[in-house]
Amino acid sequence: MSTSEQTNRSELLDRPPRVQNLRQHTVALLRRLGLLPVVDELRLWLKVMKNRERNKKFAALFPTETFPPARLCNGAYARVDYENYYEGGRRSAEALLELMSGHIEAKGARILEWGCGPARIVRHLARLGKDSGMEVFGTDYDRATLEWCKSAIPGVTFTMNGLQPPLPFPDGFFDVIYSSSVFTHLSEAMHYAWLKENLRVVKRAGLVIFTTAGDSDRYKLLPAEIRLYEAGELVVRTVPLEGSPRYAAFQSPAFVRHKLLPSVPDGELIRHETRLQLASVQEIWVVKKR
């Protein structure tokens, strides 16, 4: 984890409770009034203006690289920051390889990022695995994102997926399937359906790696939501369409361990990680297929 990431993590966790509650109550009010889309458009414009020169300078350092349009970048990562997108994606790809180490032979491995967005991680994974003959795939349910990925990112096979299973692959097709902040935008029913589907498309002894908005994201919750969270229930904010950035799900470790994982008898939890990062401060879970 970089120094700036450590600082950001500390700042998030150390915010005064009154400040946290005020912000979350404001967001909840805007959600009820249907004003979040307007606010999001304004925030997007402000992010573009704020980072325009910085992004221009960073892109000049990598003249052969293509960076995603601001709307795609913001929709997937809530940022319009090329350095965060590119360098953060590289670190996440390296973290993913560390999570695989000791379980999956990289040589010739077939790996899928489910919900790849504009290729923040998968573009680097394709490069890191090129010499070992790794086959890299990405799926997403946003058509504009997939079209951009296909036109801009070499070395990765991109395919559409739906909001609901199945994935367009046969049983046991992949050695690893991973997702970064995808379950965090799904209903409880889709948690169970998609984890089962993830395990379907990996080989026996293959890995399913996913992230959740757990204890480090607890500060975002309102008092009533905290009670659900602490009771081991999934907390879901459902006003926007499922799968959209503002459709938010928060998963306590108790929910994952005692409700989600027991729903897949062919999956075995082998690692719960809070040090490495695939999606900011989200917790990482590594499940091995029996």
Residue ranges and their predicted role:
Residues 2-6:
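Soluble, non-transmembrane catalytic domains of enzymes that act on hydrophobic metabolites at membranes
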Residues 109, 173, 205-206:
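Surface-exposed loop/turn positions
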Residues 165-177:
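A short acidic, Gly/Pro-enriched loop at the edge of an enzyme's catalytic core
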Residues 9-24, 28, 32-109, 114, ...:
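Class I (Rossmann-like) S-adenosyl-L-methionine-dependent methyltransferase catalytic domain
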Residues 176-189:
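A short SAM/SAH-binding and catalytic strip from SAM-dependent methyltransferases
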Residues 192-204:
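A short glycine-rich, Lys/Arg-flanked "PGG" loop and its adjoining helix->strand segment in the class I
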